[in-house]
């Protein structure tokens, strides 16, 4: 039986890390978070990398991490919200695993991220406006790479994980 890796995409606050941990546990896969891998490798936080290297420096590190991580088997990978901006990342995600887009409304994302200081793009006067713009810009790219789209709003983590597991079983991926 082929044991494909699962890649979670979606905006910040959609639940990729939370869902990813539960999903990995159910599948007996390793859970990895691309942002955490970058922080571990550099010894710096994502906001610190943004401050020192700018968004372009962070995106270069993210591209290298996604290339490396997507080559591993039997992992559940939570990607950063902007990972899909890079065409090579989209190609690697699509071709190397099963991609799940965790979708949520802007209002829900605002609620989930409002106290999180570890999200450099939201450190503005109007995080809601930033999230709307990001969803408008990135939404079609999330859709483009997704094998499965799951609405995470007002649904428990366990229900989201069950929906993913059901689809993986239906497509004989697990």
Swiss-Prot record:
Q: In which pathway does it act?
A: Metabolic intermediate biosynthesis; chorismate biosynthesis; chorismate from D-erythrose 4-phosphate and phosphoenolpyruvate: step 5/7
Required cofactor names: Mg(2+)
A GO term for molecular function: magnesium ion binding
Do you know which PROSITE patterns this protein is assigned to?
SHIKIMATE_KINASE
Q: Which residues form a coiled coil?
A: none
Listed binding positions for ATP are: 13-18, 119
Which Gene Ontology BP terms does the record give?
Answer: amino acid biosynthetic process; aromatic amino acid family biosynthetic process; chorismate biosynthetic process
Report the superkingdom from the record. Answer: Bacteria
| UniProt: Mg(2+) binding residues | 17
Q: Which SUPFAM superfamilies match?
A: P-loop containing nucleoside triphosphate hydrolases
Keyword Membrane assigned:
no
Per the entry, what this protein does is: Catalyzes the specific phosphorylation of the 3-hydroxyl group of shikimic acid using ATP as a cosubstrate.
Q: Which PANTHER family match?
A: SHIKIMATE KINASE, SHIKIMATE KINASE 1, CHLOROPLASTIC
Q: How does it assemble?
A: Monomer.
Q: What is this protein called?
A: Shikimate kinase
């Amino acid at each position: 039986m082929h044991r494909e890796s699962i890649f979670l995409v979606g905006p910040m606050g959609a639940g990729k890390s939370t869902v990813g941990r539960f999903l990995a546990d159910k599948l007996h896969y390793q859970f990895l978070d691309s942002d955490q891998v970058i922080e571990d490798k550099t010894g710096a936080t994502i906001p610190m990398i943004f401050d020192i290297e700018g968004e372009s420096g962070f995106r270069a590190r993210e591209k290298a991490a996604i290339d490396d991580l997507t080559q591993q088997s039997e992992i559940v990978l939570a990607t950063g919200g902007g990972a899909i901006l890079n065409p090579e990342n989209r190609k690697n995600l699509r071709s190397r695993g099963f991609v799940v887009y965790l979708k949520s409304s802007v209002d829900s994302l605002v609620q989930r991220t409002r106290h999180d200081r570890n999200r450099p793009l939201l450190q503005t006067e109007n995080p809601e406006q930033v999230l709307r713009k990001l969803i408008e810009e990135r939404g079609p790219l999330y859709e483009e790479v997704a094998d499965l789209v799951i609405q995470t709003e007002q649904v428990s983590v366990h229900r989201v994980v069950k929906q993913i597991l059901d689809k993986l079983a239906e497509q004989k991926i697990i």
